[in-house]
Amino acid sequence: MASALEQFVNNVRQLSAQGQMTQLCELINKSGELLAKNLSHLDTVLGALDIQEHSLGVLAVLFVKFSMPNIPDFETLFSQVQLFISTCNGEHIRYATDTFAGLCHQLTNALVERKQPLRGISILKQAIDKMQMNTNQLTSVHADLCQLCLLAKCFKPAVPFLELDMMDICKENGAYDAKHFLCYYYYGGMIYTGLKNFERALYFFEQAITTPAMAVSHIMLEAYKKYILVSLILHGKVQQLPKYTSQIVGRFIKPLSNAYHELAQIYATNNPAELRALVNKHSETFTRDNNTGLVKQCLSSLYKKNIQRLTKTFLTLSLQDMASRVQLSGPQEAEKYVLHMIEDGEIYASINQKDGMVCFHDNPEKYNNPAMLHKIDQEMLKCIELDEKLKSMDQEITVNPQFVQKSMGTQEDDVGSKTSSYS
């Protein structure tokens, strides 16, 4: 091993033993070029370091190995990274979250290129646990995990992370990028869409769209298109975005989504034939955007919406009559829709198989059973917790030096303008 590398190993050991993590971070940041020049000796360096005791030194070496243009032995490197992430010292890693996250991004990109996304899911779950100060902290690796779950069509591993409300962002020594935030909410929305949890999907797409922005983001544009489609499936209309949404959404993103706005306008007419015609007209656009599946679900939801409208007019109706009123192909398709809607709790009805009549019923829920009361209690507890969290965050902002300085500056400007008006 070259003398410079020996010095690197000795410094890593010494600083780790002394607990001087800040100085060790400075060392590994400066050693990238040295390590890159000695690629053939890096496995020897890894052998001289202990993963648990010298986590930052091992991290620096693995990061450089993964940065190589052509990785000669990917399987060996993959095993080294897998072992490192599972056994490294989390307290040490939090001093170099930027490099640690960078290693996770490199791993993700390599697995995506090799079309092996499933292999990285459990590794990234461990990486997130190592990085986080608490479970409600968002890291850039969350977006990587969601991307791999989407590509592997294995959604469930990401759900426990998506279900947690994020209260904080891991700054990663200034390396955290807005792209990671947008990707997390965009990919998360896609995962919830795949799981048919449209309410949560809509929330995630809304977070991506309403992120403060000064320029058009392609991620925000794609999230906006899916937001329109999921809105129609869930509510039968496009939900209005909050007032704090950036002006670029109305100025630039909406004009780039004309096909989706047309679809929403036709959807509002409750006419399936017109909607099918529009879907055929813009089929290339929907296919290019990978939204064909969602568009088909929009068409299906319009049939369901029209069936729900019939429940407000009729007490009983034949399947044949329902099919003609809703523009379905026949009584068999009408029966299929009604059965699915009964199963999903979207309507309350029964079908008489003898005469093919559908009887519509009132909602049987009386809101007076123990399970419902327990659910109400749980919802009230959530509201109380949210109120406490908002008070805590408000207090943090009130004593934040930057906020106080800005507030004082604004007050001085107001006093100055009043004084000048009196003079």
From Swiss-Prot:
It is found in: Cytoplasm; Nucleus. The keyword Transferase does not apply. Residues 197-365 form the PCI domain. PROSITE patterns: PCI (PS50250). Residues 402-423 are annotated as: Disordered. SUPFAM superfamilies: Winged helix' DNA-binding domain. One of its GO terms (biological process) is ubiquitin-dependent protein catabolic process. The keyword Transmembrane does not apply. Keywords: Cytoplasm, Nucleus, Signalosome. This is COP9 signalosome complex subunit 3. The gene is cops3.
